[in-house]
Amino acid sequence: MITMNINGKMIECQEGQSVLEAARSAGIYIPTICYLSGCSPTVACKMCMVEMDGKRIYSCNTKAKNNATILTNTPTLMDERKSIMQTYDVNHPLECGVCDKSGECELQDMTHLTGVEHQPYAVADDFKALDSWAKALYDPNLCIMCERCVTTCKDNVGENNLKATKADLHAPDKFKDSMSKDAFSVWSRKQKGIISFVGSVPCYDCGECIAVCPVGALSYKDFAYTANAWELKKIHSTCSHCSAGCLISYDVRHFDTLGEESKIFRVLNDFYHNPICGAGRFAFDVSSSPKGSANLKEAQNALKECEAVRIGGDITNEEAFLIERLRKELDFKIYNQEAYRFQQFLKVLGEVKRPNIEEIKTSNLVVTIGSSIKTENPLVRYAINNALKLNKASLIAMHPIKDNVLANLCRSSFCITHEVGAEEILLGMLLKMLNIESAALKSLEDSKQSVVDEAALKALEEERKKALEQAEQGCSIGENKAENQEEDKTEATTPKENQEENKTEVKEEKIEVPTKTTYLLLEEAGINLETYEKILALLQKSNNTLLVVGEEIYSHKQAHNIAKMLRLLAQKSAVKLILIPPSANALGIASICELSEEIFEHEKIVGIRAKGDFTINSDNRVFGKDAVSKVDFILPSLNQLEGTITNIEGRVLPLKPALRFEGYDLSDIVQGFGFVEENLIECTHKLPTEAGFKAIEFDCLTNYFTNDRVNHRGYLLGTSHFENSAKECETIECEPIKPLKEKIAFNAYLKYPETQFNNATNKSENLQLKAGVYVSKAFLKKLNKEVGQNITLFKEEEELTGVLYLDESLDQEVFVISPSLLTNHSNFFREGVFDSVDLKEQA
């Protein structure tokens, strides 16, 4: 830690921290327009200027210095900032009355803050054409060229789709003498450029550029001219689509003239701390019919008569708690196959330290295994990109399908395409590289073999050739001496003889062929020697490595052994582990419920937020339209209730209702069995402490970040019962890694596209990416089909039909199939997420 004096206040800050971040952490305000926390500074607005030890600096890109004296608000600095705001206001359209940003516009705020009362500058205005991409509308007439959108697209999202490009606008130099240097710099930047979409592929469902725009230049298409910022009520909640559990804010306002019907107009995020994906931002249009269901007795009877309850991966902790208590009362089984596998995995792995998302950003090396990061957890992908861009980290992404999104993040992205089922072998490779001894490595060691080191052999041959040439050159010199020094033949011939001897020795010297060690097991898995050496070099170079384990690991045939190997890795090395839960609240469900493996038998099953013979779920009503899902009993959607979910970091986070729901919820159903809780949140402080939950009431849960980037959202789980079960497993050694018996041929992969996660996102009309069958551009051409056509695939006489879409990031000839297209007992993907299917030709 170092100390600085800011405006007479002594503060402590981290070495290497910027002056701006240090000031913000200490609660000292320095104005900015272009700066985004956790991103590279652009110094576009110059508003963050301060004086450090008597010299003017820009606080966003200047590192804190020990014992420095800093002033942030001298009269000179305030005059400079006022001049800058005057240049920003030149020709800015006076449409605040109808601008979507009015009331929360940073240009308005800064104009008032700096006291701009008149405009001394004038210049001819220019025509600037409107533009749009994805869900964004771009009005360059409102743009102040702060380049926040460019920065977040590059440093957070990782797409590099936006760029500041040159524009032929009026930018006379006549103000150079009358404007201050910084103000003229800002003026020139604004008058000589616009933002352009430069991506090589289309952008879908993101909107982070809209979120960070400080003015009305970038707006959400469906929000334009529908509501004013000051009319909207902000409800802070948690996104429930994936396990990231991002902080979101619903902007809600009455929709009818009587004020009885409310509507979510948009979703915002705290972009300084938590970028969000398109699902969190746009899939807010789906909820349950507000009246709910009246057939309470029918739902209770269905639970009495059922043999099992199948639960969805997004049920709340409180719903899981009630279902588990009901299981003990009625003796039924609880099914959720994904959460069950995750639970079994955790019982062996135990309680390894859970890094938070911020720790990904500070890593030197990130390794991913068994995960399609871009679809499973977008926030993890954003953090990886941030580490690559700002921390100069490297990425090793190992998966049977190459992800060009990850590969194109930067030059230090290394994507490895391996054989299906090789994850256990790859983890053994990592243990070997980290010098961790384990019985698991026996089969790997047994497959060791030596091969010729071609590079070293070539170098030796070059060296030998060079030595021969030098010897021959020396011999020639000796002969010349003999001819020129006839008076002393003995002395002249002696060197020649020696040289001949040396020459003979060089010729007869045998080269020992250099070898390298390879492993047949790795070769069979798709890891050749060159790849092995590159991974080894990156691991040895890194002093802060993080391993991301994806959901495909939990369904691996060797998941039990992989869990033991990962526990060993966590105990014996400094490598950090992040496990991506397979659904939004899989960690909460696995911690609370006693799950059973679902065997495909004829049972009476009640589905709670899942399909069943009797289905208790949201009916997925798009606002203003009829419900699209047929259910037997309507539950409130997760944007209509109070409760909690547990995210990837093990953080218990609050859900808040944005829309009204007048019907019954699960707490009303279970009251018929003698339960006393009148609503779900009466269970929040009763969640099992042996699973790591704390006796904290729902209304005491906080949900915000502070300026020093500290997370004050909910609370972190404590040590859970998983650790006790893992310690029991420790007495059993790891099994030797199993070789791949044969390569698994596949042409189908079970995975949602980006921004699709569950029924709610599937039914959303706001999202551009839909559930369906996705293929690469080359494969689409080979199939001789067009986007939007229906395609039918079959396996063992069962057919699957979906709409055909293009995945621009895909190269391989594979059908990427959305899970929502499958039935519960489908023949497709019975052995895992990779399968071989046939195409049904249309008549």
Residue ranges and their predicted role:
Residues 327-335, 388-394, 411-413, 438, ...:
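Structural alpha-beta junctions
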Residues 1-24, 32, 36, 40, ...:
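N-terminal export/assembly segments and adjacent metallocofactor-ligating motifs
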Residues 92-123, 129, 149, 159-169, ...:
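N-terminal leader/propeptide and maturation segments of large enzyme subunits in energy/redox metabolism
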Residues 1, 30, 35-39, 324, ...:
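A cross-kingdom feature strongest in bacterial/archaeal respiratory oxidoreductases
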Residues 50-53, 547, 793:
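A generic structural signal for residues embedded in beta-strands
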Residues 315-317, 371-377, 552-558, 612, ...:
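Short acidic, S/G/P-rich loop/turn micro-motifs used as interaction or catalytic elements
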Residues 45-63:
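N-terminal single-stranded DNA-binding subdomain of primase/primase-helicase replication proteins
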Residues 411-609, 690-719:
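Active-site phosphate/pyrophosphate-binding segments
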